[in-house]
Amino acid sequence: MLWSLSASIILIALSAAEPASPFDVGDKSQLFVDHVLVREARNVSFTLVHGRKHPANPLVKADQPWEGWRLEIYGNVIYDDDEKLFKMWYIGEDTEAFPDYATLYATSPDGVHWDKPLVGTVRTPKYEKHNVVAEQVLLASVIKDKADADPARRYKMICWLQRDQGYHTMVSPDGLNWTRLSQAPLCRGGDVITGYFDETRGLYVAFPKIGFTVRGHDRRVFWLTTSKDFQTWTEPKLVLTPDLRDDASSLARIEEVRPILDVPDDPNLMRTEFYGIGAYPAESCTLAFVWVFTINNNARYGNQEGPGELQLAVSRDLENWERPFRTPCVPRGKIGEWDCGFFDTQSRALRVGDEVWLYYGGSSYTHGTPCLYRAEGTGRGTKYTGSIGLAIWQLDRFVSVDAPAEGGTLTTAPVVFTGDRLEVNARTKAAGSVVVRLCDAAGKPLEGYAGSDPITGDSLRHVVTWGGKKDVTSLAGKPVVLVFDLKDAELFAFAFRKD
């Protein structure tokens, strides 16, 4: 199947290859970010849903002297259920007190209004009190592990250690006092790593950035390594690289930031790379917010110049990734705004109630802007900013299947499920509706489930009924095809649930 480069893909008719046997959806929510479950789609479009930027963005700015003139998330945010507190680990610019970067700590009761408690654990003669909790640490992917019997390992960190030029693990009893756990690096690479605990798989997962030659250029790409015990890690496996479509669209992304680029283009050097990944393990798949770095030339200072943006990727096994949309999932700010130049993200997005929150770092400069380097006369820190903001999605609403007033249909591949009812995540216009038909594997409507009562309105959990009845227990474990008849409606996900 083909996906267009636009943020909305119109399908008059699509028939996809389907699994050889019924796909087991269990009782997990199924998204339409990929087409694994789509047998046929007629007169519908698949639309990328942009994260809604919080109106108070940027939420965290550089306002302490030991932070330097810019911030990046380059770390993680968790919600601590025990303390009823959001906790953030982020980085500042190198300063006289902390000359080679530092990881800092902030807290918030609501995830919006942030404090920087002076609980720093790194000694420096310049400041008696500060909020620096680790030196020379980048991408502090912090996990609170309540299952570990050892309280000294309550907090775990996967990170890049600048002094060792490698990826390492650390542990802490409180998230403030850190001890290096790994003696040798998990692997070598290039300063960016995403790490988190995957509850479904029971694995610690890390995506390190390691250079790899792709079409004649040594590029930033991503590999996968996992661990069952946080100490022994698998050999990294290459899982995510830019393709020809990425390179072909490089110039278009560069044109968006032309006014703030420091050097002219070199067509021989123009290319796309993947700078980092923010992950979100949804119920049935893993989403990645890929930091797409588009290079227009070598920079006057540092290595390469170019902008960054966030694009959505999806995988069901952590190894094979699809990127159906090649446009930003968090819109770039207008030139001059705080997030018009480059983007980075926390290591793992958060589910907060019925929303998904992604904290991201935004800058008003590009990767090769002279202000990033100690070049005389560059206006270092006087014109540009780097801050941290928040993008929000409603639960499971990352891609919508849209139908016009004349109607459209989406038919799934055969699935087997567990549960006693069907819930649909959908939104309709005033005159719109969603009707669900349940069929056998051959497409024949099942008795009693030929056409549901029309679904109208906006809900994350519309309960589907047929003649007022919702029970589907008799179909559990049997191959079933779902047919969604949509009119003036957006379909985001479906799930079979049980009480």
Name each model feature, range by range.
Residues W3-A13:
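Bacterial N-terminal signal peptides
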Residues A17-D499:
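Carbohydrate-active catalytic/glycan-binding domains of CAZyme proteins
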